Amino acid sequence: EKGYFCKKENGEYFVAGVWPGKVHFPDVLNKEAREWFGNKYQVLLDQGIEGFWNDMNEPSIFFAQDRMDETFDKIAELKDKNLDLDTFQQFTDLVGSLANNTDDFKKFYHNVDGKMMRHDKVHNLFGYNMTRAAGEAFERLSPEKRILMFSRSSYIGMHRYGGIWTGDNKSWWNHLLLNLRMMPSLNMVGILYTGADIGGFGADATEDLVMRWTQLAMFSPLMRNHSAMGTREQEVYRFDHIEEFRKIINIRYG
């Protein structure tokens, strides 16, 4: 009722699908909406939670409802047809283009000081302002504590409000090297609290890879082992050389 969600050009609310299904995106570039969103952390703070992880805040789009509706209509047209090669490729392209379609980021707008701004023009500021919403809220709601918060998406200047992790990596040796390269790059733009998913997020990790990654991560501010559903369980206690892992972790906390 207060217009705190992102809208389409015609004034209707933009509907997208992510983890919980259909959602609206909070317009965190709108100052009032940013404060409203930040205040939502109160219920979690009241439960004694002192660490937060802002994910999917590019924002990620599994599908835009308008594009999904168009896709279903086109699939219905193809249902009773004999799908030759070209038509079959059109069919697969329809479904394959649903997630994070660049055109969908041009379909919704932000209210920036009373001016409607198309999202793709300010894309990197969405994650930044979500981080800002949280950081400013923690100062208001819990001034006596320094609340831990890190984000997947953000922008230069976000170090005032929280940290960042390097996103969904893979359980590959070259992504271990990439972790080593990304951290100083982030440091050089002022982002100090950072780290990567130890062992890689996607694909199956080996014990050797997790051990080497843990050795690197003990020197990073954020030290977190994290993996995707459907991949090999990679908590360090699931491997054979538990004592070696214990020694590495003790160096950090000893």
Regions found by a protein language model. Give the residues of each.
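Catalytic-domain carbohydrate-binding cleft regions of carbohydrate-active enzymes
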Residues: 1-254
